Structures are given as C-alpha cells and as structure tokens.
Amino acid sequence: MEVEYGTLQDIGSWMELVRQVRWNFPGLETQAALEDHRRTVLRFMGEQRALCVKDGDKVIGVLLLSKKHNMICCLAVDPAHRRNGIASALLEKALLELDRSKNITVTTFRENDEKGVAPRGLYKRFGFTEGKLLVEFGYPVQEFVLRGKVQ
C-alpha cells in the first residue's frame, strides 16, 4: 500500500470519499460546507499537505495535515476498505511530515461516542494521549496529543 500526495487529478475521487463519510465529520452537513472543504483540500494539495491511498484511480483513504499547527486535520478511510491498515499507513506518513520535537495534535470523537471507538484506538496505538474536551462545529470532541520528543 502506497501513501502519496494528493494531486489535482485526485480531487473528484477524494471528494467522492468525503461525501461518502461526511456523516462522520461535523461541519460537512451542507453542500456549501462541502464546496468549502473542496477548496481547502485543493489548497492543501498545492502545499503537499494532503495524503492519500488509492486503489487504482479511486481514493480510498485521505489525510490532511498542518505543518504550521503541527496537527492532523482530517483522516478518513472508505468504509469498504477499513481494517486493512490504511489509516495506520496514512498516520505513519503524516508523523514523518510533522515536527516530532513538538506536540502533535488531532481532534476526534469523545470517549462515549460510538463514532470514536476506531479513531481513538488508532491514535492511542500511535502514542497519542487524551487531552482537552472541545466543541468543533457544534459537536463535542476531544483533542489527542502526541508529546514531542526531546532532541
């Protein structure tokens, strides 16, 4: 499985995946929000901050990262391809792109939210620990933190 940078040629398939899983991402409920997200993905692609895994030409896993904020912004895998190591491969590549000497953050669902079981387990396996309780797009979430390594 190869993790690669998303390109303009991937945007259609990328957004198809986003539409398929948008119920898992607060803030993507409307067409306007999806269009705004598409613009964001294109910007991230142009800055090599958009990672993906493909099956042929079909995007089946995506990850957006912010080097400025040292964070994982979005991670999603096609439901038909879950439990095949795609999320782990994307996260491994992202951690190579981010500054490991500083804290790396990501927000995900809270502990008692059934949508949070898989992502929380993934982040914990990579060494992230539970952080602050937050609200994003009106939805309760929790920050996870991977502590920076002292050099």
What is each stretch, according to the model?
Residues 8-74, 78-80, 91-92, 97:
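Acetyl-CoA-dependent GNAT
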Residues 98-112:
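Conserved GNAT acetyl-CoA-binding A-motif
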Residues 54-56, 146-149:
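Active-site beta-strand termini and strand-to-loop segments that position acidic
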Residues 88, 111-132:
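Conserved active-site alpha-helix within GNAT-family acetyltransferase domains
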Residues 137-141:
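Short acidic/glycine-enriched loop/turn segments that link adjacent beta-strands
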